[in-house]
């Protein structure tokens, strides 16, 4: 089972290798039973867990429970952030890798972490058109990721944010973004840079 479709490293090779390594370790462990294609649909008192596999119900009673729900992206608040075309980066990666769906033609990425850079490289490798990356930080934690995007001639707007998602009259989806420099906490510059795009990915 794979819940995350994120890229883990610059070359995009680490995730599959790590997944296979962990799967092998778990499957070979004498005290671990792996139940695939199963659903735990509740968590009752005293750690009673009904687990459904196909047409069979397993009544599991555990001493301890660990819920590994995975990581998640946090959306960014700005004007018109509920327009169609504004989407979490992880959702785009899932659409692309699981369903082979291209969400749009021109993509802008708004990020506050290095995952945004890794996602941009994922999209470029898949043949998608990344027109810009907007980073709310002044510098990327991993300089190599910034360098990789610059080498592919992707404009990177550092220390900036999306002030507003733009749309044309009577067209209720993203047609561009208004990018502004962050000048202090909670305050942005009055000077704006407008970038045409039909998808805005957020990874913060």
Predicted regions and their residues:
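Residues forming the flavin
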Residues: 1-204
């Amino acid at each position: 089972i794979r819940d995350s479709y994120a890229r883990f490293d610059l070359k995009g090779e680490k995730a599959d290798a790590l997944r296979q390594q962990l799967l092998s370790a778990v499957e070979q462990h004498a005290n671990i039973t792996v139940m695939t294609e199963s659903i735990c649909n509740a968590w009752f008192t005293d750690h009673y867990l009904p687990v459904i596999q196909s047409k069979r119900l397993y009544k599991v009673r555990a001493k301890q429970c660990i819920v590994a729900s995975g990581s998640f992206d946090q959306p960014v608040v700005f004007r018109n952030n509920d327009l169609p075309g504004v989407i979490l980066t992880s959702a785009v990666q899932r659409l692309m890798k699981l369903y082979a769906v291209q969400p749009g033609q021109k993509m802008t990425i708004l990020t506050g972490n290095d995952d945004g850079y890794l996602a941009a490289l994922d999209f470029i490798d898949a043949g998608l058109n990344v027109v810009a990356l907007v980073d709310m930080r002044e510098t990327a934690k991993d300089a190599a990721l910034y360098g990789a995007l610059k080498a592919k001639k992707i404009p990177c707007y550092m220390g900036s944010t999306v002030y507003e998602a733009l749309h044309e009259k009577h067209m209720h989806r993203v047609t561009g973004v208004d990018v502004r420099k962050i000048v202090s906490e909670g305050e942005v510059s009055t000077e704006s840079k407008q970038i045409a795009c039909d998808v805005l990915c957020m990874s913060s």
